[in-house]
Amino acid sequence: MANSIYSTTMISNGGRDGRVFSPDNTFVQNLATPKEMGGQGGNDTNPEQLFAAGYSACFNSALSLILSQNKISDANPEVEITIELLKDDTDNGFKLGADIKVTLENMSQQDAEKFVEQAHQFCPYSKATRGNIDVQLDVTAQ
């Protein structure tokens, strides 16, 4: 891909009850189907948790950059992202939804919403999902 500044590779085997790992084995994680989906659940992760973790960290980084560009250093951004696996009636399969809850300190609700929207436009995960999954933004200023 043109203009790549970073890439990473993950390999999976065994589907939802298998494992995912990097070729150099610096990341190795067992997977388990959640009980809600008929699986064993347990302490292992699943694709939705991995997606939520990546999206949350990326969104928080984008928001922190926006805040820094606006010379705001005391907002202490917290980003909580819930990824839902939803039934897709168009093909009797599944689709994803995302609920993004952001808390910012020491600013007005209006400013918090403005900065979160800017981060949502800038975040690579938000760009990748825009128009593809339902996303709900919930912003709280404290």
UniProtKB/Swiss-Prot annotation:
Stored PANTHER family = ORGANIC HYDROPEROXIDE RESISTANCE PROTEIN-LIKE
The disulfide bonds in this chain are none
Bilayer-crossing residues are none
Which Gene3D superfamilies did the record assign? Answer: 2.20.25.10, 3.30.300.20
Name recorded for this polypeptide: Organic hydroperoxide resistance protein-like 2
* InterPro entries with a match to the protein in the record: KH_dom-like_a/b (IPR015946), OHR (IPR019953), OsmC/Ohr_fam (IPR003718), OsmC/Ohrsf (IPR036102)
Q: What family is this protein classified in?
A: Belongs to the OsmC/Ohr family.
Biological process (GO), any one = response to oxidative stress
Q: Entry's Pfam families?
A: OsmC
